[in-house]
């Protein structure tokens, strides 16, 4: 089981990304939601992760890489990328949203 879970709000004009920390069978919010393209979600998440010294560098890089992947995938939505396709591509993420 991964130590972290992504929560994604899949909206028509924005995507919002938050991360939970998994503790056993429970989850604890690690971050608030960061929006793209309204704000620079990637940069805001990077700053938030840097403020948590207990997360090792490799985990931070992995979380930021996954953030890049989901943002890039969302940006392709104009090419008929749907919420259903996002759920298929990222089954480990928790999605809420509209198409």
From Swiss-Prot:
List, in alphabetical order, the Gene Ontology terms for molecular function in this entry: structural constituent of ribosome
Name one cellular component (GO) term: ribosome
Subcellular location, record wording? Plastid, Chloroplast
Extent of the signal sequence? none
Recorded family membership: Belongs to the chloroplast-specific ribosomal protein cS23 family.
Function comment: Probably a ribosomal protein or a ribosome-associated protein.
Please identify the protein, giving its name as recorded: Small ribosomal subunit protein cS23
Q: Which organism is it from?
A: Gracilaria tenuistipitata var. liui
Q: Does the keyword Transferase apply?
A: no
Keyword Ribosomal protein set for record: yes
Task: Kindly report the protein's main subcellular placement as a broad class.
Answer: plastid
Pfam families with a match to the protein in the record:
PSRP-3_Ycf65 (PF04839)
Biological processes per GO annotation: translation
Q: Which UniProt keywords apply?
A: Chloroplast, Plastid, Ribonucleoprotein, Ribosomal protein
Q: Give the record's subunit note.
A: Part of the 30S ribosomal subunit.
Enumerate the HAMAP family for this protein: Ribosomal_plastid_cS23 (MF_00619)
